[in-house]
């Protein structure tokens, strides 16, 4: 990278000094913002930003250069006096890293330090072309206006959101509680990248609540942008929306939406400056988002279930597009997330839709079953699926990106890509038709295929024929197919025809010169002597450097430049013709540009049709991807039987597997059964060795439920699954310590959110709750929360814990069931010397409570020192005896007062017995035989047994029973 870096250049010393002087006069830079200067062919970054770029992009500080500052400027220069230059190619990497991976904002200035472009994670429009890459999810930015109710502690959040990549705008009101769990679900479902909120620092009470809102936004991986409260006024917003939507519908919006959401929308329109660009006007569509239509997922669930590839800075995954064939497992070739596992999509739109489905699992059983029916159909129709995924879907372009490009700086090449897309629609229709004709037309699944895929595709074939006719009439398709040239047909415009005729004549002359030169120099014109249209020299010829010595023998050849590929040269006649050709070509392009713009404008009128077709094909692509994944898993996935909400609450999984873990080459995975049934065992407490088995077990239940509700088959032998309205997780502190939040505080905050958010139809996953504080406090917290979930909420819950005492909850509540991880250890007995690879831990989850001696067993296997193992066994036995005694007392149902009073009476008996032993001189071991000592102990036991009992003397009764 550093070898291609350009140098920072100035015309003179004065320009250089002025450059740095203006830099020192810029306003203070906001946090997490990078500033760049556009120097034309390259970009420059200065100060701490330069160090950031050196470390993050170049991965070395050797690329840094010293700024040349005069003494006066140096005094005002409060940054490291370093700079680094960035080429156009590296710029794309830098922008992607800042905006999509790290959540930074970017400001780009011209040479005079005037701001010309700015971008943020939710608004990349101004730098989209510079990034030059596909994005695997929509770039959605939201705005929030909050109104708190001091009486009940709840609040109403007016929300507006805009997807600038898809030209969509929406509004809604969210009624939320004090932990803002509904807001969290909204941010997760839409994958919001940036949130605009009110700056309420002047109001201490409201600011404290707003800080809680900001913490929730931050937890969801969103960038927070503070705006003045005045920006959230709803004044005149309906007029702005009328311009954006292109109709009068917006005038009725105040009757449909609250002042809060309208005010939030006003802030959003102003922040994005949507009305400042003419190409935005009339392009937007008003959409609705209903939270209850989708399963709720909290931020912890996204990470705990490994839905997306996670990086050190980006726990919610990268936005860089990954189409199957280049990534399913990402760049490393290893599947680490559900997204990578399921991503066998062939289209960019399909990848985006898969990303959306993973964040928005369905809760309507009929809609889920439709997806399952379609997956089933494509699994059975192997030939159809292979034709679609190998011949047709890979040829589908990114329509959203193309139409957006046509709106700005599109060209004939983009029009032809859409034309090719249009031509493929009838072919796909024909493929479906032929397969459906071979099957029984009355089968329900065939009707579903017709309604979901075939009918929408067929419906638009006729309108698109007019578009295709327009392209075929105006564009020279022969020139494109033969020479990859994008030209208007000469017969379509008389003036263009004349110029084209002259160009053809000149090109014939150029080819003639090429052939004559080949004969003169003695080289084959097809293999040795190349004719090229060079970006600097125009039409010229090229020879390899080894063959170029022949040129020196002929004076008429003029050398132009020497590169690694060879030597470019020309003749006086060829240079003249090349110059004339260049002039005519520019005139042709100028004449053609007006016609091209007209063709583009006509093409854009078909945008709604193209986008609808793209969505249909994206849906087909994702379903085909599910079918592929289900068919080619190590053990094929099966279709689950679903139970709707508010009906039979039963989830029963036979031989379930974690879909991501079973794909790892270095893991031997054991399948497990899972049964969750309302009232009989809907709360599972899982104990066992702290080596991964418990965590995997509870998470795979969540992953399988989510897979079923997005429409995919599941990794089981048999599966009954109750649809859940939420998956809520508390599985670890993550990087919270880096943000100044203690592990215990994170546990409290996340658990509070779960308790507020969960309903009887939810699935709660808790892993090792209570580790962030002392053992006693942690156990108390875990017990109280577990008891509340099991007795008050009554939803499905999986509770993995290291507190074995928690298993006693099953004696109190009938719906609590204990499970434990059995760790089977295999050791290679042939090897006399221990090796780490000798041990294989295989986890199986079975009913009951875990054997707590597992750790000592492992210590013996790995040849721990014998002395330490014996000490550990002795200590464990002491603790077991103590625990057994305590458990026996609990079973006897003795109160603490009864135990204390009974102990006083026993002590009195013991003192009397000791007094008699001393009187008889038997307290000295050297003066008493073993037989005599046994006789004295029996006397003590008889004394206890004959002690008269008082009324309700339960403790003495208990002791006497033990002596029988």
Curated annotation (Swiss-Prot):
Outcome when changing residue 730 to W: Disrupts MutS alpha ATPase activity, but does not affect ATP binding or interactions with MutL alpha. Defective in MMR, but not in NHTR
Region feature Interaction with MSH6, mapped onto this chain: 851-964
Effect of residue 773 to I: Defective in MMR and in NHTR
Keyword Nucleus in record: yes
Annotated consequence of substituting residue 695 to A: Has a dominant negative mutator effect
Subcellular location: Nucleus
SUPFAM superfamilies: DNA repair protein MutS, domain III, P-loop containing nucleoside triphosphate hydrolases
Phenotype for residue 542 to P: Defective in a mismatch repair assay
Protein keywords: ATP-binding, DNA damage, DNA repair, DNA-binding, Nucleotide-binding, Nucleus
Superkingdom as given in the UniProt entry: Eukaryota
GO cellular component: MutSalpha complex; MutSbeta complex; nuclear chromosome; nucleus
Pfam families documented for this protein: MutS_I, MutS_II, MutS_III, MutS_IV, MutS_V
Effect of mutating residue 694 to A: Impairs ATP binding; reduces catalytic activity 1.6-fold for ATP hydrolysis. Has a dominant negative mutator effect
CDD domains (UniProt xref): ABC_MSH2_euk
GO terms (BP aspect): DNA recombination; interstrand cross-link repair; meiotic gene conversion; meiotic mismatch repair; mismatch repair; mitotic recombination; removal of nonhomologous ends; replication fork arrest
Effect of residue 742 to P: Defective in MMR and in NHTR
Family, as annotated: Belongs to the DNA mismatch repair MutS family.
Functional description taken from the UniProt entry: Component of the post-replicative DNA mismatch repair system (MMR). Forms two different heterodimers: MutS alpha (MSH2-MSH6 heterodimer) and MutS beta (MSH2-MSH3 heterodimer), which bind to DNA mismatches thereby initiating DNA repair. MSH2 seems to act as a scaffold for the other MutS homologs that provide substrate-binding and substrate specificity. When bound, heterodimers bend the DNA helix and shield approximately 20 base pairs.
Miscellaneous comment as given in the Swiss-Prot or TrEMBL entry: Present with 1230 molecules/cell in log phase SD medium.
Protein name: DNA mismatch repair protein MSH2
Protein's organism: Saccharomyces cerevisiae (strain ATCC 204508 / S288c)
Source taxonomy: Eukaryota, Fungi, Dikarya, Ascomycota, Saccharomycotina
């Amino acid at each position: 990278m550093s070898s291609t870096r350009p140098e920072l250049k100035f015309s003179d010393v004065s320009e250089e000094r002025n450059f740095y002087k203006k830099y020192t006069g810029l306003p203070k830079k906001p946090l997490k913002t990078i500033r760049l200067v556009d120097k034309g062919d390259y970009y420059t970054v200065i100060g701490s930003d330069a160090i950031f770029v050196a470390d993050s992009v170049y991965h070395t500080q050797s690329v840094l250069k010293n700024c040349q500052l005069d003494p006066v400027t140096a005094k005002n220069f409060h940054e490291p006096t370093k700079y680094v230059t960035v080429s156009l190619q590296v710029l794309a990497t830098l922008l992607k890293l800042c905006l999509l991976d790290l959540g930074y904002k970017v400001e780009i200035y011209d040479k005079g330090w005037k701001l010309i472009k700015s971008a943020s994670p939710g608004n990349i429009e101004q730098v989209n072309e510079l990034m030059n890459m596909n994005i695997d999810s929509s770039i959605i930015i939201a705005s929030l206006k909050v109104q708190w109710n001091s009486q009940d502690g709840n609040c109403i959040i007016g929300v507006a959101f805009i997807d600038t990549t898809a030209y969509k705008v929406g509004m809604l009101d969210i009624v939320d509680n004090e932990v803002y769990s509904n807001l969290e679900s909204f941010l997760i479902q839409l994958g919001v990248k940036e949130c605009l909120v009110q700056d309420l620092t002047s109001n201490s009470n409201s600011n404290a609540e707003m800080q809680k809102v900001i913490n929730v936004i931050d937890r969801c991986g969103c960038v927070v942008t503070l705006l003045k409260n005045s920006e959230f006024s709803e004044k005149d917003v309906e007029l702005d929306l009328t311009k954006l939507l292109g109709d009068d519908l917006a005038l009725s919006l105040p009757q449909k939406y609250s002042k809060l959401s309208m005010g939030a929308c006003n802030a959003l329109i102003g922040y994005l400056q949507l009305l400042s660009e003419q190409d935005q006007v009339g392009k937007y569509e008003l959409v609705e988002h209903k939270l209850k239509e989708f399963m709720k997922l909290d931020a912890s669930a996204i990470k705990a279930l490994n839905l997306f590839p996670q990086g050190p800075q980006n726990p919610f995954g990268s936005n860089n597009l990954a189409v199957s064939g280049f990534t399913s497992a990402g760049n490393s070739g290893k599947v680490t997330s559900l997204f990578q596992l399921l991503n066998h999509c062939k289209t960019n739109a399909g990848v985006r839709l898969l990303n959306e489905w993973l964040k928005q699992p369905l809760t309507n059983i009929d809609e889920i079953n439709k997806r399952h029916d379609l997956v089933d159909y494509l699994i059975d129709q192997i030939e159809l699926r292979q034709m679609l995924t190998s011949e047709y879907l890979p040829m589908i372009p990114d329509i959203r990106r193309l139409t957006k490009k046509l709106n700005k700086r599109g060209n004939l090449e983009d029009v032809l890509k859409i034309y090719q897309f249009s031509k493929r629609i009838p072919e796909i229709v024909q493929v479906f038709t032929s397969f459906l004709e071979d099957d029984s037309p009355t089968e329900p699944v065939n009707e579903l295929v017709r309604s979901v895929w075939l009918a929408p595709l067929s419906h638009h074939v006729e309108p698109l024929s007019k578009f295709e006719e327009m392209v075929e009439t105006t564009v020279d398709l022969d020139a494109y197919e033969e020479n990859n040239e994008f030209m208007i047909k000469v017969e379509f415009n008389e003036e263009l025809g004349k110029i084209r005729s002259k160009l053809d004549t000149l090109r014939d002359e150029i080819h003639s010169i090429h052939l004559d030169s080949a004969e003169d120099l003695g080289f084959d014109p097809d293999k040795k002597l190349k004719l090229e249209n060079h970006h600097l020299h125009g039409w010229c010829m090229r020879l390899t450097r080894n063959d170029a010595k022949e040129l020196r023998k002929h004076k008429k050849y003029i050398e132009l430049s020497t590169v690694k590929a060879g030597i470019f040269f020309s003749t006086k006649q060829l240079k003249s013709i090349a110059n004339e050709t260049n002039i005519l070509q520019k005139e042709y392009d100028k004449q053609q540009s007006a016609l091209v713009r007209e063709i583009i404008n006509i093409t854009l009128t078909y945008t709604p049709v193209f986008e609808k077709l793209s969505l249909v094909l994206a849906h087909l692509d994702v379903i085909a991807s599910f079918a592929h994944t289900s068919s080619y898993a190590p053990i094929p996935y099966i279709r689950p039987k679903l139970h709707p909400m508010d009906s039979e609450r039963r989830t029963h999984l036979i031989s379930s597997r974690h879909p991501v873990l079973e794909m790892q080459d270095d893991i031997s995975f054991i399948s497990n059964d899972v049964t969750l049934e309302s009232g009989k065992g809907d709360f599972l407490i899982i104990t066992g060795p702290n080596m991964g088995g418990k965590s995997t077990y509870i998470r795979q239940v969540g992953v399988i439920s989510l897979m079923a509700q997005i429409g995919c088959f599941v990794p089981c032998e048999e599966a009954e699954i109750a649809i859940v309205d939420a998956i809520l997780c508390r599985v670890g502190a993550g990087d919270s310590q880096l943000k100044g939040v203690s592990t215990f505080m994170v546990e409290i905050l996340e658990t509070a959110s779960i308790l507020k958010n969960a309903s009887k139809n939810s699935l709660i996953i808790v892993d090792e709750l209570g580790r962030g504080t002392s053992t006693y406090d942690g156990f108390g917290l875990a017990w109280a929360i577990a008891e509340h979930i099991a007795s008050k909420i009554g939803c499905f819950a999986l509770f993995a814990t290291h507190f074995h005492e928690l298993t006693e909850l099953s004696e109190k509540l009938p719906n609590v069931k204990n499970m434990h991880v059995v760790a089977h250890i295999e050791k290679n007995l042939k090897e006399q010397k221990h090796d780490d690879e000798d041990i294989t831990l295989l986890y199986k989850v079975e009913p009951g409570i875990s054997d707590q001696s597992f750790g000592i067993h492992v210590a013996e296997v790995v040849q721990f020192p014998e002395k330490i193992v014996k000490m550990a066994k002795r200590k464990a036995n002491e603790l077991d005896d103590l625990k057994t005694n305590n458990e026996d007392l609990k079973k006897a149902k003795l109160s603490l007062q009864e135990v204390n009073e009974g102990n006083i009476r026993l002590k009195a008996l013991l003192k009397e017995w000791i007094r008699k032993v001393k009187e008889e001189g038997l307290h000295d071991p050297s003066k008493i035989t073993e037989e005599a000592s046994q006789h004295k102990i029996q006397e003590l036991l008889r004394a206890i047994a004959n002690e008269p009992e008082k009324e309700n003397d339960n403790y003495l009764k208990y002791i006497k029973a033990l002596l029988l």
